[in-house]
A protein has these predicted regions:
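Structural preference for beta-strand elements that scaffold enzyme active sites
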Residues: 42-44, 66, 85-87, 108, ...
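Non-membrane alpha-helical structural segments and their capping/turn regions in soluble enzymes
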Residues: 25, 29, 95, 114, ...
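C-terminal active-site-proximal or functional interface alpha/beta core segments in diverse enzymes
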Residues: 180, 184-276
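Active-site beta-loop-alpha junctions enriched in small/polar residues
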Residues: 26, 48-52, 70-73, 91-93, ...
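A charged N-terminal "starter" segment
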Residues: 1-130, 166-169
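Flexible, glycine/proline-enriched loop segments at strand-loop-helix junctions
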Residues: 104-111, 144-155, 178-186
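Short acidic, glycine/serine/threonine-rich loops at helix termini
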Residues: 56, 79-80, 98-103, 120-123, ...
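Conserved anion-binding
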Residues: 112-171
Length: 276
């Protein structure tokens, strides 16, 4: 594979007629190492962000061993990664996908309703080795793609679901997602405050907490707050929760790990003024 110092160097040397992928494995590795150093828990790469072998290899080389998978094809791909811990975090899954995932060794499943919980119990044969995550609906504040109306449960339904899931789970987790490309940490403040109320209402012991994804990357039209601000806000919010001191944490960065690691160089044949 040819190595060049920059996109400009490539254009000057090759004058490509067709689109060219620019790969920067060091960028993915740098981002992964930052999360592994700053976040005191499991860093699960959101597989759907980009599952190219190049990027997965760069993340694995930096130390990533947990993966947030959202479909059976993703699981069948990721299960080949040595020492991988897979978390099936899509809260709506087919019976076949649940059953096959369990056969492939997946023990971590997300849900946001009693119907989904019943499916998981039935398709795993009432297994007692499950890590079950209840996904809570939280507000999406300053996010490019809000998810609050798509997935999650709230209020008394959430409390009831937590109680029922506690009975079926070897480990019980809480998870949420503040929305994709969230540019300020405000959403995490609100989400963790909502979780505080829910834990008190349900009165159950939580074994794990997943703060989800939404961690941003920089684009020409998006200048998010520094990543350190997100981490400080999240960890401060966790400190206020009525959970055990040694609760195991997880986060699910996607674009924040890989957005700067790959680009596509294309030729523009014409433009009108400064418009593209």
């Amino acid at each position: 594979m040819e190595k060049l110092a920059s996109a400009a160097a490539l254009i000057g040397k090759r004058r490509p007629e067709r689109p060219v992928r620019g790969l920067r494995p060091h960028a993915a590795g740098r981002a992964a190492r930052w999360f592994l150093e700053k976040f005191p828990g499991d860093v699960a790469y959101a597989y759907k962000a980009n599952n190219s072998a190049f990027l997965i290899g760069a993340l694995y080389g930096a130390g990533i061993r947990h993966f947030d998978v959202a479909s059976l094809p993703e699981i069948e791909d990721a299960v080949t990664i040595p020492d991988a811990h897979l978390h099936f975090m899509h809260p709506v899954k087919s019976r076949h996908a649940i059953r096959r995932a369990y056969e492939l060794g997946v023990r971590s499943f997300a849900l946001d309703g009693e119907d989904e919980l019943d499916k998981i119990i039935e398709e795993t044969g009432g297994a007692r080795d499950l890590l079950l995550w209840v996904r809570i609906a939280v507000p999406s504040i300053n996010s490019r793609i809000p998810l609050e109306r798509k997935f999650g449960v709230s209020g008394q339904k959430a409390a009831n679901l937590l109680i029922k899931t506690r009975q079926a789970a070897s480990e019980l987790g809480l998870t949420f997602h503040v929305g994709s490309q969230t540019t300020t940490p405000d959403a995490f403040v609100t989400a963790l405050a909502d979780l505080h109320k829910l834990i008190v209402k349900a009165g159950v012991m939580i074994d794990r907490l997943d703060v989800g994804g939404g961690f941003p990357s920089r684009y020409p039209d998006s200048d998010p707050a520094p990543m350190d601000d997100f981490m400080e806000t999240i960890l401060a919010g966790i400190e206020t929760l009525p959970v055990k001191e040694n609760i195991r944490l997880m986060c699910e960065p996607g674009r924040a790990l890989v957005a700067e690691a790959e680009s596509l160089i294309v030729r523009v044949d014409a433009r009108r003024g400064h418009d593209l």
